[in-house]
Amino acid sequence: MPNNQLSNATISNTINMSAWQGRTDPEDGELGMRWHQKVLPADQANEEGIMLLGFACDAGVARNKGRTGAYGAPIAIRRALANLAWHHQEPVYDGGDISCDDGNLELAQHRLGEDVCLALRQKHKVIVFGGGHEMAWGTFQGIGAYLLQKQEATESIKAPLNLSEEKTAEPNVKGTAIPTPRVGIINFDAHFDLRNPPSGPQASAGSSGTPFHQIARFCELQHWPFNYACLGLNRGSNTQALYEKADRLGVLYRDDTELTHRTIEQTQAALNTFIAECDYLYLTIDLDVFPACVAPGVSAPAARGVSLEIIEQLMEPILTAKTEQGDSKLLVADLAEYNPRFDIDNQTARLAARLTWTIARAIR
């Protein structure tokens, strides 16, 4: 999207702490704390921790001809998370929501990327609540900007950053090439979300079905490897063309029928190899990977899906992966496609909250 269109559009960015309410147990003192008593607004982030961001947007779902309603997901996930018991060491901050109120998806993704990049520069880990899976392109814009800035700082180059332009490989001041960052994208999802944008593979306007195509295009322009794993696919919801494209791109994928207790060891081995070959990780969970009986509140409910127990086992090596310096490889995790409009008794919100709780407890 041209810069003048970005600047003329309106996207709201607000921090509303009213969702953080719940039960209190004063008789238990500090050991009786719950999330709503511990989460702080981002302007009180005085030390490294976990930054929560929201992406209130389903414009990409609408473009992809899906069921809208994911706009209301971030606040609903916070409400479900608020009453969970606190078992964490790191502080957690709420950085507010990017709200796409006028259908300008490209600006919303750009603004989400800015917030993700800022949080990473402040040395926080990031968890994003969505919103349609178009959020993944916004999240990755933030990861990409952060890593490019790290590269440029190392190379002592002060040229302005432009994510839309091809980056040529340049040596640092000593003439030694800077290693290309290897970002592993791990997507638990019933869909590849590798579609070409409607106006062509090089177009910037996408949908909830195109984010990983857009990420692949970005990686191509930056001369980065595209390391993508998609686990939990519903073969009946992905065309042969998408499987062929995934093969061309070297995607590691598994269908939902392959993610069972009988076969999980093979998948774990492949995933461990994938993780070992990456410097950084980005975990994205589309809640439609779970069975509809577990996650009814999604844009595209799954007739079969993958059990929470299997997903949790596959998440473990992602959450515990460390760099050579002992830091978590995981930079950002996000939860996509929660649709409160179709939820039953907040069941899917509770699932999203439990996943958030698990991620937050493990990544530090």
Curated annotation (Swiss-Prot):
InterPro entries hit by this protein: HutG, Ureohydrolase, Ureohydrolase_dom_sf, Ureohydrolase_Mn_BS
Keywords, in A-Z order: Histidine metabolism, Hydrolase, Manganese, Metal-binding
EC identifiers of the protein: 3.5.3.8
Annotated residues for binding of Mn(2+) 1: 133, 189, 193, 286
Cofactors, names only: Mn(2+)
Protein role: Catalyzes the conversion of N-formimidoyl-L-glutamate to L-glutamate and formamide.
Cofactor binding note: Binds 2 manganese ions per subunit.
Organism ancestry: Bacteria, Pseudomonadati, Pseudomonadota, Gammaproteobacteria, Vibrionales
Pathway named in the protein's UniProt entry: Amino-acid degradation; L-histidine degradation into L-glutamate; L-glutamate from N-formimidoyl-L-glutamate (hydrolase route): step 1/1
Domain of life where this protein originates: Bacteria
PROSITE patterns in alphabetical order: ARGINASE_1, ARGINASE_2
Broadest EC class assigned to this enzyme: hydrolase
Example GO BP: L-histidine catabolic process to glutamate and formate
Family named by the database record: Belongs to the arginase family.
Pfam families in the record: Arginase (PF00491)
This protein's name: Formimidoylglutamase
GO molecular function, one term: agmatinase activity
Reaction catalysed by this enzyme: N-formimidoyl-L-glutamate + H2O = formamide + L-glutamate
Residue numbers binding Mn(2+) 2: 189, 191, 286, 288
SUPFAM superfamilies: Arginase/deacetylase
